[in-house]
Amino acid sequence: MDVKLELVAVPVTDVDRAKAFYERIGFHADHDVAVSEEIRFVQLTPPGSACSIAIGKGLTRMIPGSLDNMQVVVADIEEAYADLRGRGVRLTCRRQSARSLCPCPPSGRRSRRRAPW
């Protein structure tokens, strides 16, 4: 039996700012639906991925910023670095290790506890 991860909720306080950030790093906005004043659903998918993230308002009881880790995989770290830099994404470091990048949040502040949006 195959099990595939489809969608992961990422709680945020500022949906528009978070959406702009994810689009800036290359995610595609598949859906952006305001169901009501209290509920908005935004689904974003990284290029080539079968799994998406969901940001929005009224989607989860998780505290905004409480998801403190997300990993993505790329075939070529140098190409990914150049692509992000070309998109104007500021990186806090070129590499933490041979296979990782450290994107800087939109505010320029690093935060392990809470996302700036």
Where are the model-predicted features located?
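Short, conserved charged micro-motifs
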Residues: 17, 77-81
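Conserved short beta-strand elements that form part of the metal-binding/catalytic scaffold
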Residues: 28-67, 74, 93, 113
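Vicinal oxygen chelate
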Residues: 32-33, 42, 72, 81-117
